[in-house]
Amino acid sequence: MDSAESPTKTQAGEDENYSLLCQAHEQFNNSEFDRCLELLQELETRGESSGPVLRHNRAVVSYYKTGCTQHSVLLKELEALTADADAPGDVSSGLSLKQGAAAATVARYNRAVIYYHRHMFGTALEKLAPLVARLEALEKAMAALVATLQLQLLLATNQLNRAEAFLDYLQYKLNLVATAPSSNAAEEAAVVGTAPPSAATNSSVVASPGGAAVEGAVPGLGGSLQLLQLITLVLNRKPVVIQEDGTPEYAALKAQQYYIMKDFQMAAKQLMRINNECTQAGTITPQLSTCIANNMGVIHLRVRHYAIAAKFFQNALNFDQQLARNLRQSTLQTMSSARSCEILYNLGVAMLHLRRPKEAFQCFLVPVKQFHSNPRLWLRMAEACIMEHEAKLVEEERQSQSETPSTKPYAPQSAGVPEPTLEFAVLCLRSALTLTQHYKTRFHMAAVSSEDVEAPEPKDPTQESWRHPQDNNFCNPSKPVSLESLENMMAAIYAAHSFVSLRLGDHVTALEMSEKLLACERLSDAHKLLGHMYAGEALMLMDKASEARDHLDPTFVGTLNAFDFETRDWQLKSVDAAQNVVRYNLAVAMALQNDLPQAKALLANLTHSLVANKALALRRFMDLKMGPVPGGTPS
């Protein structure tokens, strides 16, 4: 956040007022906030014409005086200040703010900073938009501040393509960041001198260490923009060499680059090195510990070490809770560092893989309040509900076999109650389906516009060009999704919706969802099998056995890919198992149509352990229904 601004003398006849403002600025830097406020009040009583400047500075000083915790009070004052201004920069003042930026401009910037630290990124982008629109007209220092915040917001909202385009705009139009070296061999050789020899042979883009990212004497901004430049390139999978400067920020970015390159072992080693070095130096903080523990959990989750990942996420949550004990009385920096929602999301996914659905559901309840537009999160909640219900069925079956009657039979629950029930799963799946259908429409619109361009156009570093790229960031806080990922998620939602509807006796919806599942593009073989099975079961339950037989034709199973069935916790581990299950269901459909001889012949070939007992029971039922064979002897 911009602090109380240092004065700039603009009129020779205001020496006394200028001296008082200099004293106020000195008192602010010395943390003498009471004395600073007195000097600002004295300036106001003198009829100083820089009313908006004094008003802004007084609000900032009062904010610092209260320990930087009264964000709402400062925000109201800043909103009132910007409301009084017709447009950014219209305020003319005798004693102007640092680098000539107007009070209303800085107030707008500070408002966006507050929203950013509160994790209200969309609102922050909206408040910052007027300043970004006139970025070229701002003073160099103010433009660098606005550009830095805008780039941070684009990255925070996973608008990676737009962030890269905005970075090009800052490089080629405003010259606020160092231009990335070209992949041209001659130009690359000129940059190699600032990088290790190995870096030149492995990368076409080299980040020169220590290069000034901002021209002019703007302390602190150069390094900040340079780091954001590297983060943008890494997240967009651009080849770039990261020169570590001993700070954990660059070291952590190096670990993230390893992770994106799927070198998970090196990513974990890099994070452990950061932890060890900072611990030995005594510079470890709860924020850094939270980041390291969460990222270690993500790495282990990626390599399917779910129990270890869950342990790291729990450690990260403990570190984060040290920061978020009382957010209402926390500073903006502490509030910005809190990551409980993201960590709980990760922990919930790990718990699902560990088949602990109740714990997973409780974890998802917190992030869904913030990321309620994420269809993948709604699907995960539905999966937790389904898994919990199936676990209860297994327990009830075990109790029935041990002759211990269940004392609490299943009863329908309210769909609006956030409990891991099938009724709430339906609500989650409806939300996921509505969001995914909406995002798929938007995705295709963006995809068509991008495919129209056959050859890459030269970069156009203008104010409007960086706004053109679109990002499919539909699943925040996760990274943008691909079209294939979106279609897979759509298929998973249809399959889960059909399954839950069958469990709840809603056969019409189950059939509708299964038919939509079979109509999906790029459908995996596993989902194709589920679609036919669910459709066949729904039709049989609707007394439409003849139509169900069309979905239970076992010939389609032979064309399925066996690798699609190698899913953890699936009972169908092979094509042979799938063939037996489909044939058994087909025999049931035949039995319902009284085609008993053909059904009995089909059952004779079912030997897989999944259906052997059920096939034997069905065969005995048909024997009883068909009666004794003429001339036969009783067995």
UniProtKB/Swiss-Prot annotation:
Annotated region (Disordered), positions in chain: 396-416, 450-474
Alphabetically ordered keywords of this record: Coiled coil, Cytoplasm, Nucleus, Phosphoprotein, RNA-mediated gene silencing, Transcription, Transcription regulation, Translation regulation
Residues annotated with Phosphothreonine modification: 45
Biased composition annotated in UniProt, kind: Basic and acidic residues: 456-470
Coiled-coil boundaries: 131-165
Principal location listed in the UniProt entry: cytoplasm
BP GO terms, sorted: mRNA catabolic process; negative regulation of translation; regulatory ncRNA-mediated gene silencing
Phosphoprotein in keyword set: yes
Entry keyword annotation includes Glycoprotein: no
Cell location: Cytoplasm; Nucleus
GO cellular component: CCR4-NOT complex; cytoplasm; nucleus
Domain of life: Eukaryota
Quaternary structure and interacting proteins, as annotated: Component of the CCR4-NOT complex. CNOT10 and CNOT11 form a subcomplex docked to the CNOT1 scaffold.
Role this protein plays: Component of the CCR4-NOT complex which is one of the major cellular mRNA deadenylases and is linked to various cellular processes including bulk mRNA degradation, miRNA-mediated repression, translational repression during translational initiation and general transcription regulation. Additional complex functions may be a consequence of its influence on mRNA expression. Is not required for association of CNOT7 to the CCR4-NOT complex.
Family affiliation: Belongs to the CNOT10 family.
Name recorded for this polypeptide: CCR4-NOT transcription complex subunit 10
Organism listed in the record: Drosophila melanogaster (Fruit fly)
Underlying gene: Not10
